Structure formats: C-alpha cells, structure tokens
C-alpha cells in the first residue's frame, strides 16, 4: 500500500491511528471480499464543516441554493442534534498514484467503533463508484469546481447577480430533465439546429441537452447552463440508490463480523450501529434496510445453489429445503454491483421468498417496538409509506411486481421521466413535453387494443400517486422554461387520479387544458 493511500486527517495533521486502521480495513475489503476502489482521503470534521460539505457537494457554485442548504443542514445538526456519520464527496486527481482520490468527510464526534464502521461502509460506496456502470461515468471532478466558482462570480460582476440567479434557477429546473436512462435508448441523436415541425426527429429524453442545442440564448446564459448541467450529471446515480447504500451496509456488516472474531464487544457495537441505520421501520432508511437484506439474501442463495430455472420450478416447500454447496455468493454480489441498476436489482432478484422473509422480519421488529412504546400499530405508523407497503403485501396480497415499482419510486431510484416527443418543438407552437408512462406497460396483460386501453387506464389510476407530477413545483418549472425560451410550454401527464391532462405555461399564466 502506498505511503499516501487512505490517509485520515484532522485539520492539517494526519491521524496515525485511524490511518493505520483505514488501511487495515481497505486490505480486508480487497483481499478477503474482492472489492476494488480508488484512493480516499478521510477528513475528521465537526458538524459545521460537515454541513458546509453537504451544501457544496450538491451545489458547488456560490448560489443562494448553497447558502440555503448550508443553513438547513447546520440547523438540523447544531440545534436539532441530528448527526451525519459520513459523506463521500467528489473525487480529485491524485498525481502521486496517477488516479482518482475521493474526499470523504467523517464526523469527528463519532466514537471509535462508529468511525471504523463508517470507514468500512465508505469502501462499499467507493467500490460502487468505481465499478458500477451507472456511477463510473456520472461523477463530478472536484478539481474543476473552484474554477467554476470563480467564473460564476465573474459573470455576476459582468451581468449582475439577479440575472445570473435567474438562469441558474432555470438550470436547476432543467437538471431534473436530464436523461436518467441514456443507455436504454440507442437511436442516433440529431446534432443540428432545426425549426422544422419534425424537430426533434425522434423522441428526445435529455431535455436539458436539447434546450442547450436548440434554444437561442446569450453566450453567458449558455455558459451558466453548461456549468449546471455538468455538475448535476451526478443525478443519474439515483438509479443505484438502493444498491449503493445496501452494498455499503453489506460490507460494513462483513467487517463487523471480522472484528467480532477477536473483539466481541466492539463487533457487537458495530452491528448495533449498522442495524440502527438499516432500520426498515423508518421511511428514509429503506435504501439501507432493503438493499442490505437483499444483498445478504442473494449471497445466501448463490452459496446454496438456490437460483436458476430448475430451482425456480420447484414447489415452494422443496425450494425451502433445497441446498447445495455452491459457494458463489460473494462472486454473484460483486457481479451485481458492476452490472445492475436498482431496477435490475429489484425486479430480477427480489423474489417472493425474499418478500416473505423481509415483511416477516419487519413486522416482528414492529411488534417489539410497539410493546416497548405501548401504542397501537395503526396509530403511530399508518402514515408511513413503508407500513402501507408492507400491509398491501401481507393483508391485501397486492401483486409484488407493483410493489417493486412503488419501492423504486419512493426511494428515488426510478423518477418520473419527461421527454420531448418527435416533432415537439418549433418556433411557432413552442415546446411540448410528455411524461413517459411506458413503465406501466408491464402491468397490462391483454393483447386486444380496446381492452389494453381499459387496463392501462386502471393501471394509471393505481400508480397515479407515485407518478403524477401535477404539483406546484411542476407549474413553477414550466413557467420558468416558458419565460426563458419565450414560447408556450405544454406538458402531457396524468393527474392525481390517473386521468390524462395537459398543463400549459404561456409566459403569463399556467393552467390545465
């Protein structure tokens, strides 16, 4: 291991003890588990520095949004006693190793077993960032952020902060309209400007990119939008949110098990820390809880040969009793981290047996929690989406395939997709946007056209709550785009009940047709 690999710093000084531990954990991850990851520099920081790091990670430009995020994060940490264990920041170029080095922030108020568990957790994130096909091409280079900030300040001097923020706000809006799934669409894209009615010549899913190429704007406006697009390309990594947190928690538990072999007390504390975070009784912790347990289940199934066509055709009881000594669990887990998005992860590997185990464990934990607090189940948890999700599976016996999509939408791993349909832009009629609801086709079974329409209407109604974008944020976004391009903007979508609706922004008002 190189002399500058995996340094742990507190201020300007290297913490020798934690640096040695970080290197020992890295060696365990690489040699025992087979992980591969880039170099990292761990920085022990206080809550104020952590809040600043969180704010500038998402918005490295010196904007109102960065300041707002900092104030919110700092208030939560300092006044509400909320604590963030770690944050993996952007990478920078490491000249010594001729490769990438990630900057990782760890809360220095953490206890020793927490810091060591967090370092193990971070190595899981770094493995995903290096190897997963979604993450590898959608990370932001920290080394250019300072140059972007200087240029942003210069533009404020040239045209005024209000003008710059107006375009920045538009950029934030368009950042939600990048193509989250570019690898799934292989049509060759047009690269030339056109005002014909067949522009674009195909369905265009990267609305941000299309606006940059086809809308007339001032050079400084284009420069700001290009800055924002570059920075917000990291949004695509939401496609692996469950896998990211699940795999990091998975290897964190592996390290806790290793520690337990020689130090039971510390190993137990590490397990308690992990399962306090990967808690299925908390809406916000679902990516950790579900991802961890699904990775563990996959490892067990591939260790015991419980997979494949022959196994899947066995009766339920025979599947439970089936077991071979295959020992390919970790190999399979690593293969998934490289080749899958959350969509593949959930739809391919979350089978009925796992759903039964997961819901049983969650309900057992719930009963313990309720006995301790002496409250009625529905009284405390009826508004939690995870509780409704579990009840739909156990009480209502909802199709697991529907519940999988809901899980993906609730954890941001599948966001509503908006695109420009073929011929949806010209200088007379404006810009037409359409919500892509093709994801619902998997729940329509009939081949008869009339019946398919009826079934699709029913499916839209069932998923309307998760997929509708008819809210104040959408109205404001459409108005912002319309004012910038000086043309009407129409969005074809569904309302809260699943009915087709078109929202129009004409530069003065926003209304539904």
What are the language-model segments listed below?
Residues 6-11, 100-108, 228-240, 273-280:
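Glycine- and acidic
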Residues 79-86, 101-119, 235-243:
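Short pre-active-site segment immediately N-terminal to the catalytic Zn-binding motif
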Residues 87-101, 215-231, 267-268:
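Active-site-adjacent bridging/hinge elements
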Residues 110, 138-142, 197-200, 233-247, ...:
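Active-site metal-coordination segments of metallo-dependent hydrolases
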Residues 124-189, 245-263, 274-284:
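Post-HExxH zinc-binding segment in Zn-dependent metallohydrolases
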């Amino acid at each position: 291991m190189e002399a500058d690999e995996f340094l742990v710093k507190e201020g300007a000084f290297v913490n020798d003890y934690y640096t040695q531990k970080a290197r020992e954990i890295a060696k365990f991850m690489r040699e025992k588990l087979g992980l591969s990851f880039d170099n990292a520099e761990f920085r022990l920081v206080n809550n104020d520095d952590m809040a600043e790091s969180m704010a500038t990670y998402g918005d490295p430009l010196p904007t109102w949004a960065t300041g707002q995020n900092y104030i919110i994060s700092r208030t939560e940490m300092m006044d509400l006693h909320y604590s963030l264990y770690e944050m993996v920041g952007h990478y920078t170029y490491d000249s010594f190793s001729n490769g990438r080095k990630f900057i990782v922030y760890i809360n220095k108020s953490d206890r020793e077993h927490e810091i060591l568990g967090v370092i193990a957790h971070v190595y899981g994130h770094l493995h995903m960032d290096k190897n997963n096909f979604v993450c590898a091409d959608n990370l932001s280079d920290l080394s250019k952020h300072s140059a972007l900030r200087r240029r942003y300040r210069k533009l404020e001097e040239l045209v005024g902060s209000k003008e710059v923020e107006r375009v920045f706000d538009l950029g934030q809006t368009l950042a939600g309209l990048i193509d989250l799934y570019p690898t799934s669409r292989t049509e060759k894209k047009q690269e030339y400007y056109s005002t014909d009615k067949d522009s674009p010549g195909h369905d265009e899913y990267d609305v941000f990119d299309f606006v940059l190429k086809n809308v007339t704007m001032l050079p400084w406006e284009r420069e700001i939008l290009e800055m924002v697009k570059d920075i917000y390309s990291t949004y695509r990594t939401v496609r692996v949110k469950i896998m990211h947190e699940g795999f990091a928690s998975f290897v964190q538990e592996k390290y806790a098990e290793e520690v337990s072999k020689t130090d039971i007390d510390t190993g137990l504390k590490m397990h308690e820390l992990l399962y306090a975070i990967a808690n299925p009784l908390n809406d916000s912790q679902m990516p950790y809880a579900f991802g961890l347990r699904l990775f563990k289940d996959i490892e067990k199934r591939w260790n015991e040969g419980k997979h494949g066509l022959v196994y899947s055709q066995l009766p339920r009881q025979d599947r439970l009793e089936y077991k071979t000594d295959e020992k390919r669990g970790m190999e399979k887990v690593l293969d998934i981290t490289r080749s899958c998005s959350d969509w593949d992860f959930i739809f391919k590997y979350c089978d009925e047996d796992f759903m039964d185990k997961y819901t049983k464990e969650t309900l057992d934990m719930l009963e313990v929690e309720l006995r301790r607090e002496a409250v009625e189940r529905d009284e405390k948890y009826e508004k939690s989406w995870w509780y409704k999700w579990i009840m739909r599976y156990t009480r209502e016996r909802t199709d697991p395939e529907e519940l999988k999509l809901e899980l993906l939408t609730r954890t941001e791993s599948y966001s509503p997709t908006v695109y420009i349909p073929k011929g949806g832009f010209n200088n007379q009629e404006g810009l037409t946007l359409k919500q892509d609801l093709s994801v619902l086709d998997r729940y329509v079974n009939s081949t008869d056209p009339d019946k398919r329409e009826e079934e699709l209407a029913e499916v839209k109604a069932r998923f309307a709550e998760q997929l509708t974008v008819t809210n104040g944020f959408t109205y404001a976004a459409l108005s912002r785009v319309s004012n910038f391009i000086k043309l009407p903007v129409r969005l074809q979508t569904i309302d809260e009940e699943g009915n087709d609706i078109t929202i129009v922004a004409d530069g003065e008002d926003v209304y539904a047709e």
